[in-house]
Structures are given as C-alpha cells and as structure tokens.
C-alpha cells in the first residue's frame, strides 16, 4: 500500500484524506520503513502538501494522542516556527500574559527545532518544569490558569518519525500538523504560520476536520509566524464553518511600526530574561507592544473584548503595572 502512495506522490498527485490517514497509521503500526517514510515526507514537501493531506495526518495523530482532561476549555497560542527570523518567544510571553488576565491557557510546545530556543526551553529557563501527567496538567489549567504541554510526552506516533525527520533536516508535513495537535479541551486557538500558502492550507485542513474558532496569521512583510508590528499581517479566521481572510497593520490601532530587528532573540536564557522584563513592565516598548497586540487578538477571538484596540490598551496597561510578573511569581511559589 505504501508503495502505491509513493508512486502517486512521485507523479505529483495529491493523496486523499483517507490515504494520508493510512500513511500515519502505517507509521503507528511500524509497517513503513525509514526509507519509505523519508521518501513520503520529501515527496509531499516537493509537490506541496494540500489541505486534505494535512487534515489526514492531523486526524490520526490527534486521535492517537494522550488527552488532557481539563474541565475548563482553554486557549492555545503557538506557531509553526520555521520562519528563520530568530525572534524572541512572543507566543510564550502571550500565554503567560493571557493567563494573568484570567484566561485559561493550554500551552502546547516543544524544544527548539530551527530556532535557538523553543517555547519549552524558555519555559524551563523561567523556572517551570514540564509534567507528563495529563491529570496534573489539567489541574494546572483549571486551578492555576495555565498548563504546559510538552508535545513529545503526548504524541507517541510523532515520536516514531523523529529519527527520519531529524535525518531529513527539512520542514515536513509534521511541522504543519504539530501546532494543530493540542490534546487539551480548547475553546479557541491563535496560530502563527511561517508562510501565507501554508497558513491557507492549514486553515482549510482545520475546516475539513470541523474545528472552530482558530485564528491563523502570518506576518507578510517580514515573514514571521507572529502578528507583526513591522508591517502587514494576514489572517485566516475559522469560525462557524467558514474562513474569513483579512489583514492588519499597526497603524490600524494607532501603534507605530518597529524595525524587525527590534524583536530578535537569543538562546533560552536570553529569551527568558526578555520575557521577565516584559512581565515586569520594564522592557522596551516594542517588546511590550508586540506581546500586547498578540494578546489582544486572542482576547478578541475569545470574545473578551469588542475590538483589538480595546484589548491592546487593556493588556498594555496590565503589563506596565507588573501584573503579569505578579502572576508568574505566584506560579513559581513566590511573592512578587
């Protein structure tokens, strides 16, 4: 069966939803060789993955994942990575900011793949440990306001493909599927993507899977997987069974533009220091503004604010008062 799919891919033809599912099932059953899996992943990449293929992968990978039984629906804020921009961990800062505002957050993340510091690397540098216990993470979400989900603990099938992916050394369909695999009970998601084409494909894949309330975005002018303050950001908003496309520029809500270099990060320790300064409200205004605007869009998606402008002003004031730092210190068992 795998050889038939390989032949189809080599001819530049797309797999169906069910055929893509079969590929993942063959990985799970260990019926596909490493050579065949490498060929499938490279072939899909060369011809271009389509929404049905992404949806098929996500469907099985999510079904096989260990689930987080949180009672209170949560939001996830993450990105695909792979934009080669080396920004600091903006979505991680947003996750703690939202939680400090009373929004339940299920932060799904991993270690660095293409950047110097993945979200989990930075979260650990901030002094937090990752649990592999679904019940413990659910309690963290329900009682503390934020749970940290280290992806490899919860996605055994993905783990079976790690060796081949590492040896290939390129982005594959797993990079698109990964951010769509949060195993917690979600009420919404904001998801940054490294390219416009992939963003559209991921949105359409989510529509096929009947997912809802997901805001996909891509910083078009500077090519980042964040809502940008250096230029235009394009969005695909999946809500109530349809996808709306729109764009945003900083001037739309009265924010000045910043140079892309303003948001450069470093290793995990350096990025943790940047986040600490943001949480305290003593960071550069550019850093506070980009966290505030990304947080504002999440609040808007969740219906917590009527406009992004309202959300931005509220979040910026909250950060400047050091409220995020107070919350983070409480999580760490300290008094700010």
From Swiss-Prot:
Give me the residues that bind Mg(2+) 2, please: 225-226
Q: Which cofactor does it need?
A: Mg(2+)
Protein source organism: Dictyoglomus thermophilum (strain ATCC 35947 / DSM 3960 / H-6-12)
Catalytic activity annotation: N-(5-phospho-beta-D-ribosyl)anthranilate + diphosphate = 5-phospho-alpha-D-ribose 1-diphosphate + anthranilate
Might you report a single GO cellular component term? cytosol
> Which lineage is the organism of this entry classified under, starting from the top rank?
Bacteria, Pseudomonadati, Dictyoglomota, Dictyoglomia, Dictyoglomales
User: Which is a Pfam family this sequence falls into?
Assistant: Glycos_trans_3N
Gene from which the chain derives: trpD
Gene3D superfamilies (UniProt xref): Nucleoside phosphorylase/phosphoribosyltransferase catalytic domain, Transferase, Pyrimidine Nucleoside Phosphorylase, Chain C
Q: Which residues participate in anthranilate 2 binding?
A: 165
Q: Which family does it belong to?
A: Belongs to the anthranilate phosphoribosyltransferase family.
Protein name as annotated: Anthranilate phosphoribosyltransferase
E.C. number: 2.4.2.18
* Positions with a binding annotation for Mg(2+) 1: 91, 226
Q: What does this protein do?
A: Catalyzes the transfer of the phosphoribosyl group of 5-phosphorylribose-1-pyrophosphate (PRPP) to anthranilate to yield N-(5'-phosphoribosyl)-anthranilate (PRA).
GO MF, one annotated term? anthranilate phosphoribosyltransferase activity
Q: How does it assemble?
A: Homodimer.
**The organism sits in which domain of life?**
Bacteria
Q: Which UniProt keywords apply?
A: Amino-acid biosynthesis, Aromatic amino acid biosynthesis, Glycosyltransferase, Magnesium, Metal-binding, Transferase, Tryptophan biosynthesis
Q: What class of enzyme is it?
A: transferase
> Which pathway is recorded for this entry?
Amino-acid biosynthesis; L-tryptophan biosynthesis; L-tryptophan from chorismate: step 2/5
- Report the record's Gene Ontology biological process terms: L-tryptophan biosynthetic process
Residues involved in 5-phospho-alpha-D-ribose 1-diphosphate binding? 79, 82-83, 87, 89-92, 107-115, 119
Tell me the residue numbers annotated for binding anthranilate 1: 79, 110
Q: Which InterPro entries match?
A: Anthranilate_Pribosyl_Tfrase, Glycosyl_Trfase_fam3, Glycosyl_Trfase_fam3_N_dom, Glycosyl_Trfase_fam3_N_dom_sf, Nuc_phospho_transferase
What's noted on cofactor binding?
Binds 2 magnesium ions per monomer.
